[in-house]
Amino acid sequence: METKRRYKMYKVKKHWVTIAVASGLITLGTTTLGSSVSAETEQQTSDKVVTQKSEDDKAASESSQTDAPKTKQAQTEQTQAQSQANVADTSTSITKETPSQNITTQANSDDKTVTNTKSEEAQTSEERTKQAEEAQATASSQALTQAKAELTKQRQTAAQENKNPVDLAAIPNVKQIDGKYYYIGSDGQPKKNFALTVNNKVLYFDKNTGALTDTSQYQFKQGLTKLNNDYTPHNQIVNFENTSLETIDNYVTADSWYRPKDILKNGKTWTASSESDLRPLLMSWWPDKQTQIAYLNYMNQQGLGTGENYTADSSQESLNLAAQTVQVKIETKISQTQQTQWLRDIINSFVKTQPNWNSQTESDTSAGEKDHLQGGALLYSNSDKTAYANSDYRLLNRTPTSQTGKPKYFEDNSSGGYDFLLANDIDNSNPVVQAEQLNWLHYLMNYGSIVANDPEANFDGVRVDAVDNVNADLLQIASDYLKAHYGVDKSEKNAINHLSILEAWSDNDPQYNKDTKGAQLPIDNKLRLSLLYALTRPLEKDASNKNEIRSGLEPVITNSLNNRSAEGKNSERMANYIFIRAHDSEVQTVIAKIIKAQINPKTDGLTFTLDELKQAFKIYNEDMRQAKKKYTQSNIPTAYALMLSNKDSITRLYYGDMYSDDGQYMATKSPYYDAIDTLLKARIKYAAGGQDMKITYVEGDKSHMDWDYTGVLTSVRYGTGANEATDQGSEATKTQGMAVITSNNPSLKLNQNDKVIVNMGTAHKNQEYRPLLLTTKDGLTSYTSDAAAKSLYRKTNDKGELVFDASDIQGYLNPQVSGYLAVWVPVGASDNQDVRVAASNKANATGQVYESSSALDSQLIYEGFSNFQDFVTKDSDYTNKKIAQNVQLFKSWGVTSFEMAPQYVSSEDGSFLDSIIQNGYAFEDRYDLAMSKNNKYGSQQDMINAVKALHKSGIQVIADWVPDQIYNLPGKEVVTATRVNDYGEYRKDSEIKNTLYAANTKSNGKDYQAKYGGAFLSELAAKYPSIFNRTQISNGKKIDPSEKITAWKAKYFNGTNILGRGVGYVLKDNASDKYFELKGNQTYLPKQMTNKEASTGFVNDGNGMTFYSTSGYQAKNSFVQDAKGNWYYFDNNGHMVYGLQHLNGEVQYFLSNGVQLRESFLENADGSKNYFGHLGNRYSNGYYSFDNDSKWRYFDASGVMAVGLKTINGNTQYFDQDGYQVKGAWITGSDGKKRYFDDGSGNMAVNRFANDKNGDWYYLNSDGIALVGVQTINGKTYYFGQDGKQIKGKIITDNGKLKYFLANSGELARNIFATDSQNNWYYFGSDGVAVTGSQTIAGKKLYFASDGKQVKGSFVTYNGKVHYYHADSGELQVNRFEADKDGNWYYLDSNGEALTGSQRINGQRVFFTREGKQVKGDVAYDERGLLRYYDKNSGNMVYNKVVTLANGRRIGIDRWGIARYY
C-alpha cells in the first residue's frame, strides 16, 4: 500500500521551505502535486536546512515549473477566489525517494539588474557566471539565517491559514486516475480548462488533458535573453526612407520587406546593400517566440533550416542561432538564383499559416451559424492612426424600415435589413458617395449614348439590387432621377416605358415606396411566400424540416398586397410585381443545401468548386424530374397559372423555370416549359376583366387520403367589360376570361356527391369552354387550340357555371403537379385575340408613379438569366447572342420588359458564389460593362446588339443597378476595423476590435472608374437641380457633387468582409501595444532593427514579474501570450497581475501563476459558474453562443450562468445542467408538468400548439403547461390525453359520448364519417357526438347502433318495424327482398320497412309474418282469416293443389288459394 504524506512549504521572505507530514488533505498554494520533495519527518526537515548550490539555483530559475512568488502587487489585487495561504499542504502518493534538498531557497536580486539567460549552446561568460553565483550565494545565506528564526512563526501562520484544507476525495466529481486528479463532467469525460473554487482555493484542470494542475508554478522560463548578436548591426534597417521598408500607409505588415544595412553575400561576406537588396522582415525579426519557432520549422520544410524541430521549450538563444543559420542558407540561394521571387513566395505562404495573420483570428463563422455571408464583416471606425479613412457618416442599416435610424414601419417587425451584405460595403449615407451613385445610374441608363454613341443601346429601366442592404436615400435619388430624366411621373405610358423594379424583400418596403411615391415597383413578397408554402413545399409527412411544410391554399387569396377574397377584392390596390423563383431565390439556396448535404459538408454551400457545382446540379436536375422531390420545388406550373391569371400584379417570368439553370443558355428546356409556354400565350388572349378567387371545401373521401385538406381553389377572370360575375359584358367578353382550378393535395379524392362549381359569370352562361391545361397521372397536358380539345368541351349552365365532380378532379403526384391543376378558357377566341391594354398618356391623380391598372397588368417581365449558366465553350453560345436571336420567342410569350443579367466584368477572387460563377454581381469596376474584356454573357458588342434587338421588337430592357458593394479592389489601405456581424454589431470575443487592418479599398486610378466617376455630375446638376437640392432623409444632407470619386478609398466604405489577414497582419509590438510604422522621426520599429540593445523574456524586478517582447520593449498595460499559448496581463507599472481584475471595462481572472482564464469556466464555492471567453472577458448580462453558434447560454449581471427555469426579460426559458438553453424541446419539471421551449427563441411556449420529435402535438396554456382532456381553443374543440398528447384520427369517449378528432388538424369532427381500428363506421353530427339510431345524412338513410357503430348488412327493428341496411354503403334498403343469416326473407317497402301480412309484389301474392319473415313452404292465415299456402321456393301463393306439410298433415288448396286440412 502506498504511503500518503503531506508536504508543508513555509515561506520565509521570498524563499520556500518544504516539510513532509503524513496527511490526506491538500491546500493548493505554490507547490505542485508532483513536486520533487523528500519524504522525511517534520523533525528531520527542520533540522536539515541547507543551501542549494548556485548551479541548482540557476537550473531552478530556468525551469518551466518555477515558483510563482507572492508579490506586493499580487496581494493588493487578490480576491477571495485567489487568496493563497503561505502554507501548502500536498497530498500525493510516494512510491520512491526523490533526490532533493529538504529546504530549497531561491535568490532574487533586490535591485533591478537582471541576468540574461543563455542556452546550453552558448554558455554564459565566466564573469557573468561568477557574478550570478555570488548573488545567489548572498541571497541563500540571508535566507538560511532567517529560516531558523522564522520557522516557528511560519508554522503558526500556516496552521491559521490552513483552517480550510481541500480534501480531493470529498469533491464528488473529482476522480483520481493513474495518479492524477480529474474533474468528471456530466458526460462522463474529464472537464478541460476548468477552474473550481473549494474552501477559498482555486483548483485548475489543464486545458489539454483535464488533469489537476499546480497553478503555483510559472509556465515559462524566467530570465532575459539578449537579442543583439553579431548579425544585428548588419540586419538593421539602412535608413528610414520610404524605399527602405515596404509599408501600407507607413504601417509595417507581416509580409513587409526592408533594406538591411548589409547583406550576407553568398552566405559568407557582409556587403553593403543596394536599393534593390530587400529582404523579408521575417528573416531577422519575429513578433513573438511562437512565430519564430513556426518560421524555423517552416524553413526546415523548405530545405533552408537546421533540420531540428523547435518547440515552446526551446531556449530563445537556440532560436536566435538557428535563425542565423537560416539566413545564411537564404543568402546563399539568393546568390545562386540571382533573384528573390522564390523567397517572396515562401514568406507569403508562411504568413498565411500563422493564426495572427489568417482567418483563425477573425472569428470566421463560415463553417457554423454564419453572421455574414462571407463568414464575417469588418466595420471601419474613425481613429487618429488612420485619419485618412475617417468618415462623418457610416450610418448603418438605414433601410426603408428605419431610414432615420428609428423604425417607421411595422408590417415587418424586424429591422428591415442590414448593411453588410458582401465584399467592400459602400457607405451610401455619405453625400459624396450618394452623388457618385447618381452619376453611375445615369451612366448605366445612358450607356449606349455615352459609350457607343447609339441611343438605341440605352437601357430603359432599372432593377435596384439588395434594397434592404443599402441606405434608403438611394431609392429616393433613383426615383428623382427617373422622374426628372424620363418624366415617369408625367404619364402611365412614360412609367411603363421605363418600368423599374426593386429587389425589396421586407414587408415594410412596399408601404415606404408608396409613401415616397417611388418610381419602382415593389415585390408582393407576401404573395410570393404564400405561393411557396401553399404549393412548392413538401407535405408534412415528407418534410425533413417541419418549419418548411405545405400550408393550405387560403393565404394565396388573402396574404398579399392585394387581397383577392370576395370581401377584400375591392379594397385599395397597390401596384407590384410577383415571381416564384429568381436567380438568387429558391435556386442558390437549394444548390447550397445539396452541396452541404451530399458533396462537401465542410462548406457553407455558397463557396464551392466548379466541380462541386456540377455534381450538385446533377442531383438538382434529377430531383426536378421526380414526382416526390427532395430538394426542388413542387407545383411550379400551378404557381404560374395563378400569377399569370391574377389581376393587379405584374408577373416576372424566371429563366430557370423555362430552361435548366445550368448548361448553355437556352440549351435544355425545363420539365415545366410546355405548361408555362401555354400559360404565357393564353394570358395574352384570355386574362382580362374582373377576378374572383375562392376555395371550395369538398367533403372528400378521407378514408383514401393521406392528408385531410380538402380545399380546392378556383380563380376566375371574367373578360373585358365584366368586373363581377353578374355583369353582362359585351360581345368581346364572350371569348375572354379564364378559370384556374387547383388543389395542393396529391391524395385528394372527391366523394360521389362532391361538386366544385366555378362561376364563369352571367356573360358566359350556356357557353362552351375547353381545357387549356389538364392534369393526368403522367403530368400536364396542354391544349393550345379549340380543335385540340374538341372532345373535352364543356358547357356552362344557365347561370354561367361550370360544374366539376369526382370524375374531373382528383389529386395527382407527378413531376409537374403535386395536387391538381386545370385551366379552362372559352371556345371561339381568334388566334390573334389580344386582351392587353395600352398605357394612358395621363398622370395618376394620386401622384403615384405606378397604380394598378389593366395597362400595368398587361406587362410581363422576363428575368432572362440564371446565376448558374455554364461558361461558354464557343463564342456562339454567349447569352447576349442568344437573346438577340430569340426576341420573337420572347415577344410570343408576351414579354414587355427584359431584365438582363448584370453586365459588369466579374471579379475572379472566388471569395463568394458570385465571383466563383462570375454572374456579374461581383465586380471590381462597375463602369466596366464588357469593355476591358468579355463578361460571362459576351462582348460589349454582343450586349449592345441584344439591347437593340429587344428594342426593335418593342421590348424594353432593364439593367441591374448594384449599389451595395465592390469586390477585390487592387489597392490596400490600413484601416481601423472591428469584427462585426451583418448589422454592424461587434461580435463578442472577436480579437479584431479597433484594430489596424489592411483592407482592399483602393482602385488604381487607371480603370473606368477613373474615367467616368463623377463625370456627369455637373451636367446633371445643371439639368436637374431638384435632385441636388433635396435634403436626404438618413443624413440630413444634400448629395455632394463637389468631390468626384475617380478612385475608391476606405473613407467611402462602411467596411469589408474578413479577408483572411488576421488580427496581427499590421504588425505591432504587443508588449507596448504600439504599431510599427515608418514615419520619419516618429518611426517605431523593433529595437534590434535599429541596432539598439534589446532583450526578451520574463523576469522578476523585485516588485513583480515583468516581460520584455522580442522587439525589446517592456509590457505595460498590455496582454502578452507566451510560447505555450498562455495569456498574461501587465499593469501600468509593467507587473504581472493575478486574481480577479477589472480591465478595460471587463472582468477577467488570472490564476496564481498569472495565466489568464480563457474559454474557461470558473465554478464558485456555491456551485454557480462564471465563464471567461475567448479574450478572457467574463460573460455577463446576455446570451452567448457556444459550439460554433449552435448552442446558447445566458449569464446574469454578476456573470452567473443560468441553469434551470429562468425568467429573462419577461420570458420564461430553460437551461440544462450545463447551462445550454433548451430550444425546440420538451421539459418535464419537478411538478411533473410538461413544458415546451420554442425552437427559435427558446421561450416557453404559451397559448399555442407545439409538437415533439415523435410528431405528437400538445397545447400549452398561459402557464406553459400542456392541457389535457377536451379543450376549446380559438373556437375549435380538441382533445388531449392525460399525457398531454393531442388525439388525432381517433375515436374517444368523453363523458359517455363518442367523439372523433380529425387525423390532420385534430379538431373535433363534425358532420363527418370516421372508422375505428376494426373498420366500424361512425358518423359525428354537428355537435361532434357520434349519432345513434336512424339518420338521414347527405340524403341517405342510415342507421347507427347504440354504441355509434353504423349498421351494415344487418336487420334492425325500431319503431316496431324491421329495416335492413346495405352491407357496403349502409343505406336503408327499399323496395327489395333481403334475407337474414338464417335464410329468412323480408321485403322492404318504399320506406325501408319490412312488410307483414298478405302482399302482392312483382305480380306475386306473398305473405310475411308479423316479424316480417316471408312464409315459404307453409301455411298462414291472412287478414281475412283464410288459410293460405305459399310455395316453398318462390313464396308465391299456391292454387289448385294438394300439399303435404312439413308436419305430415295434408291440405287441399282450391282455385281461390284457400287451403283446408284433410
From Swiss-Prot:
Effect annotated for changing D255N: In strain: MT8148
Polar residues bias: start-end ranges: 37-52, 86-108, 154-163
Spans annotated as Disordered: 35-164
Highest rank taxon of the organism: Bacteria
Subcellular compartments: Secreted
Major location (coarse): secreted
Transmembrane feature ranges: none
Family assignment from sequence similarity: Belongs to the glycosyl hydrolase 70 family.
Job of this protein: Production of extracellular glucans, that are thought to play a key role in the development of the dental plaque because of their ability to adhere to smooth surfaces and mediate the aggregation of bacterial cells and food debris.
Protein name according to UniProt: Glucosyltransferase-S
Organism expressing this protein natively: Streptococcus mutans serotype c (strain ATCC 700610 / UA159)
